[in-house]
Amino acid sequence: MAVCRKPLKKIEEGGAGAVHVDVMDGTFVPEVSFGQPVVRSLRPLTKLPFDVHLMVQNPERQIESFAALGADWITFHQEAAAGKEAKLIEKIHSLGKKAGISVKPGTSAETLKNFLNSADIILIMTVEPGFGGQKLIPQCLEKVRELAALRSELGLSYKISVDGGVNAQTLDSVLQSGVDIVVSGSAFFNGTLGWR
């Protein structure tokens, strides 16, 4: 795992607050990526919290495993868990982890309203999940603004995260939308984020 030390060191030195790990199953999204063996290998290499983003069908099958491997935050997609969201949030909390729920660009923020009082993190995908290096879909930031306004109006404390297409050109508009957590992969690692 020596090959993983360099990116993790860059993440730490760049001032990141967590390591975001995309887990893709090739079914919910077309790509396949990091699985349990990779997380098991990476976890001992950093003290930063691990933010595991389950872009998978049937996320309930993987929550316990990733919790046991050291995930600190576990986020699943509303679209993959329709009807089971509350149970999954409860399950993640019962394992002592922070629970996140995510939506794709085409899914309305309305689908999240019943979970805003129990989720710790609301992750808004600003690209179609599954591939890095895509352009941010600006209309998705309207969901962030809506969720930030609701949080204030209802006195809730969930964090709002944005994932996808964040780079030097989009960072300002993302930060002005009311977001708390910015996920950046391609732009961070290729040095074009323009932010350290």
Model-found features: residue ranges?
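Hydrophobic faces of well-ordered beta-strands that scaffold small-molecule active sites
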Residues: 19-21, 42, 50-54, 72-76, ...
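Histidine/lysine/aspartate-rich catalytic loop segments that bind and position anionic ligands
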Residues: 102-138
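Alpha-helix-loop-beta-strand connector modules within alpha/beta enzyme cores
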Residues: 32-52, 91-102, 140-160, 164
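Catalytic cores of alpha/beta
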Residues: 4, 58-68, 107-119, 164-182
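Conserved, mostly hydrophobic/aromatic
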Residues: 11, 22, 66, 122, ...
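Glycine-rich, proline-tolerant flexible connector loops at the mouths of alpha/beta enzymes
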Residues: 19-36, 76-78, 127-135
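Glycine-rich phosphate-binding active-site loops on the catalytic face of alpha/beta enzymes
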Residues: 74-82, 123-134, 177-196
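Active-site beta-loop-alpha junctions enriched in small/polar residues
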Residues: 24-26, 55-59, 79, 104-106, ...
